């Protein structure tokens, strides 16, 4: 089955490519999701008229992703986690936890865009890639720290502020 792609599809092709796919993939995924259309002569002509609109939309998405990547680049994200003996984490740091941490910083990123080779299971610093668009990737540094140390720092910081206010 020949399909004209109406958007970039990972591991398949880019906007405007005519690709051959298995009929089930085309009928059950590409066509219903609006990612492609059947490659007939009439659809090829209609697509050429629609191509500029789709390309403008894709460029706008790429530019928005580049703006978010500029905010993310060089960001150090501290993730407080409960630890047991020998600094072993209870559980692990997953993409959902990293996504929540970024949301707390005011940067909304879908957890599926965060690329982890495997879950983080120990304290330390880990470089994590965030794929915002097919062409735009940013790298952040995730620093996994003990929850106890974060609480100690949080308790000592407010204690110092009232003294400064009293002076």
UniProtKB/Swiss-Prot annotation:
GO cellular component: ribonucleoprotein complex; ribosome
Keyword Ribonucleoprotein: yes
Keyword tags: Ribonucleoprotein, Ribosomal protein, RNA-binding, rRNA-binding
Superkingdom field: Bacteria
Pfam entry (one): Ribosomal_L9_N
MF-aspect GO terms: rRNA binding; structural constituent of ribosome
InterPro entries for this protein: Ribosomal_bL9, Ribosomal_bL9/RNase_H1_N, Ribosomal_bL9_bac/chp, Ribosomal_bL9_C, Ribosomal_bL9_C_sf, Ribosomal_bL9_N, Ribosomal_bL9_N_sf
GO BP annotation list: translation
Function: Binds to the 23S rRNA.
HAMAP family found in the cross-reference section: Ribosomal_bL9
Record family assignment: Belongs to the bacterial ribosomal protein bL9 family.
Name the UniProt record assigns to this protein: Large ribosomal subunit protein bL9
Lineage, top ranks: Bacteria, Pseudomonadati, Thermodesulfobacteriota, Desulfovibrionia, Desulfovibrionales
